[in-house]
Amino acid sequence: MRLHHPLTLVLLLGGASAPAQDAMARLRAELERIHTLDQRDRQNVHGYAPGAQRDSVIAHMMHQDSVNRVRVTAIIDSAGWLGEAEVGRTANQALFLVLQHADARPDVQARYLEEMRLAVEQGRARAHELAMLEDRVEVNHGRPQIYGSQIGWTEGRPFVKPMIDEERVNERRAVVGLEPLERYTERFGFTWSPPVKQERVLRLGPGKP
């Protein structure tokens, strides 16, 4: 894996020609459009009650996700992980969002996770978004997540999907810039509670504060 790709390397060296600058501007505009499509479809889903119309919106969203995935992975392959300094926050975030929503292809998520890790090391991607993609990859491969960002639903009620070492999850979240899990889960209409330490229960005995 290369540290930099041809187009971004030219810009980093400060010798960007007019054609290179034009190419970057086009990529920025395209990624901003992809960002809009990704978020618009998800907002549209929330406007429908369960039924045929909602199913149709979801089907359209999944199709758009696949189109976005093909284009974004092609951009990363040819130009690298474009940082905010090159294309702005919205276009940069589009790279993450499209991979995060590529659940139909967990193999693609896992492959580009490595590219995003390198981008974080280079300051071209954000650590908290990497953490969310890491969780997505773990869950989609049937493994417990690390940061607790993935929420499931059972009988209409939300819950945090299984994760490693729950007692220290907020320590891990703080390292990558994520808010405490209790606050995060409030967005989904519930509040996660840290597990009670088993040794404390045994020491105090049942029914004691």
Question: Where are the regions a protein language model picked out?
Answer:
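Mature-region segments of soluble proteins
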Residues: Q93-E199, L204-P206
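Bacterial N-terminal signal peptides that target proteins for export
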Residues: M1-L7
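Basic/polar N-terminal segments that are highly enriched at the extreme N-terminus
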Residues: P19-E32, P195-P209
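N-terminal helix-rich structural modules
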Residues: Q21-G142
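A generic "functional-site adjacency" signal
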Residues: G14, S66, E166-E167
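Hydrophobic h-region of N-terminal signal peptides that target proteins for export
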Residues: V10-P19
